[in-house]
From Swiss-Prot:
Enzyme's top EC category: transferase
Entry cofactors: Mg(2+)
Residue numbers spanned by region Required for homodimerization and kinase activation and localization to the nucleus: 428-527
Protein name, per record: Serine/threonine-protein kinase NLK
Region (Disordered): 22-72, 90-140
Post-translational modifications reported in the UniProt record: Phosphorylated on Thr-298. Intermolecular autophosphorylation on Thr-298 activates the enzyme.
Bias type Basic residues, positions: 26-54, 122-131
Xref: InterPro entries: Kinase-like_dom_sf (IPR011009), MAP_kinase (IPR050117), MAP_kinase_CS (IPR003527), Prot_kinase_dom (IPR000719), Protein_kinase_ATP_BS (IPR017441), Ser/Thr_kinase_AS (IPR008271)
Amino acid sequence: MSLCGARANAKMMAAYNGGTSAAAAGHHHHHHHHLPHLPPPHLHHHHHPQHHLHPGSAAAVHPVQQHTSSAAAAAAAAAAAAAMLNPGQQQPYFPSPAPGQAPGPAAAAPAQVQAAAAATVKAHHHQHSHHPQQQLDIEPDRPIGYGAFGVVWSVTDPRDGKRVALKKMPNVFQNLVSCKRVFRELKMLCFFKHDNVLSALDILQPPHIDYFEEIYVVTELMQSDLHKIIVSPQPLSSDHVKVFLYQILRGLKYLHSAGILHRDIKPGNLLVNSNCVLKICDFGLARVEELDESRHMTQEVVTQYYRAPEILMGSRHYSNAIDIWSVGCIFAELLGRRILFQAQSPIQQLDLITDLLGTPSLEAMRTACEGAKAHILRGPHKQPSLPVLYTLSSQATHEAVHLLCRMLVFDPSKRISAKDALAHPYLDEGRLRYHTCMCKCCFSTSTGRVYTSDFEPVTNPKFDDTFEKNLSSVRQVKEIIHQFILEQQKGNRVPLCINPQSAAFKSFISSTVAQPSEMPPSPLVWE
């Protein structure tokens, strides 16, 4: 994983400070100095095509050519039975499942319709599909990760041969709460338009509503995540740290401008590709900020090590400052290559925080519950020990520690915002490097680099969650989500659907969701 070189560029800094676009003077220099390569060790095979597959083995996905003879159709059906993703028909929706129409996940379908599913590809084709023989040396699908609520697989999009990620949102319609949560995440993934925030490229065609149990979302495939990089033995330069932190805050500024709290920022939810481009992912716990302080918010959020003190202390109302606390913990972890506050329990978590920050004032604890305040006041009075942050690593410079101390503030109202953190001088080099050779918003010409007028864009309008207020039954939400997915189908692209007969799909459908360690944390009950 390498970073390209970036020279200090006066015009770019002028563009940032003045808010105007600028072209770099002179030619853009191309002697790029490559930083240590950080390949994700156990994901290395993403870069290498696997051994050739034959029809009938678990090939990833297949488009199917329009059949001209019954023999060709039979061959196509055999190949498609192995493929997990297939281009669907343009109008596959009927009042009830039509003969030969795949009803969707095999697990949800009656046996006789499962048998008909094998004939799906034979029954409906689309003229934009390619010849199946072109696609036979595709890597098999494989699981690549588990989120708060869902499992992610890498697959090949049969329409263009690109590797993409496929996220299964399972058990969507168990109850009204899970329906609303999944619909919220789905709407967010379709709303996001930012290079440092993962968004939906596509949603697989749903089956007829009677068989509609799972939702499959296609997103960009990223090679690694910050957790894997931090625990790897490869060195992380200060340039890596700056460009990662810059992108985390750039994505967070966008999310917060949309009025969204992520509520589970941790290294494993920060995806990184081989060029060091970073994207915030997993919005299973995200929600719109609650401006009415009298309304209670759930405390079952944020993985413990990254949980802000106000949540640990049982505050019933919190702000997007909880995400900034998590970023501070990650910043320290990037510098020190170990978890900053690694406690066995939520109470010990709070004690480790006060060891570093000192005993908080009553004002800083004003939103805490009485039991948590009593715990702090019972204990010894602690002095802050912030200078210990300089011992994280040689990269913990004055500028780095200064910014870190603005993030790790006990009182959420005094914690720095994503917008203000981006203006900190520590991130100037990260911004320069990102916009000189990593971003999609600036471009190079023969006379130099043309910079965007807005380095850290926000969204307008905000994400609107008023749709949730009127959701009253599982059946109603199911119909609304089904309709929403149909409306999302991107223009004239061939819609994709799951092939429930493929071996890969059967493995996918049975893969477990969220390992026990990944489950959302339980709330701390203060006596």
